[in-house]
Amino acid sequence: MDKKKHRRYLSMTRKERREVLQCYAAAFPDWKVILDGRIVRTHGPIMQQIGFEALSRWAYRPHVVIWALALPTVAMLHQWLDIKHRDIGMRDHPRQWKDVVVAMEQQFRPSVRKPLDLREVTELCKHEVLERTNDLCMLAILNAYLGENEQALSYCERIQAAPLPTLLPPLKASPAWERQRREFGLRLKEAIEQGKAREFLEWEQSEWERGNKKM
């Protein structure tokens, strides 16, 4: 079997993943390169990440997502590209990756070329929010950071009332991350009421960055 044809049935090597990452990092020079295969930028309480999921058929899939830095189990606005640019085979990568960058610029929201605007991110999250702790925590964090205390408090209360994931077996205890988010909502509510919301969020972020908190 031809070597390149055989490669179609295998995952990308570590070297190939680095090569893919280097191409896109060059297209986004102001973003930080994370060696596990991501490029990121941060603003206030959030991080925007472009990642490249390695697929089993010698290909990768670009995506973008917004993470909450004060509670990194929380993410929203996860997007893939259209069908034409969704899965990029390594044989096509050298001639196609620049077209993928253009597709990212046209399709990903919030824009990967404009500075991050927290109010725009908040509005985008509102359009897809569901009554689950992940989404409600994100909006509580964004509103608290922006000083929109009434809205933030409302989201904190909704965190406590959010139903548990429907896929949990009957009588199964809630997952650790669910309990973590509900506890976070209570502590954020207290910080807002004390006028210390931003300080609380910055402290929580620093604790994760120092490794004092774990997923």
Give the residues covered by each predicted segment.
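Intrinsically disordered, low-complexity regulatory regions enriched in serine/threonine/proline
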Residues: 2-9, 44-215
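Amphipathic alpha-helical segments
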Residues: 13-35
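Short, surface-exposed loop/strand segments
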Residues: 16, 42-45
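An N-terminal domain-cap segment
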Residues: 34-42
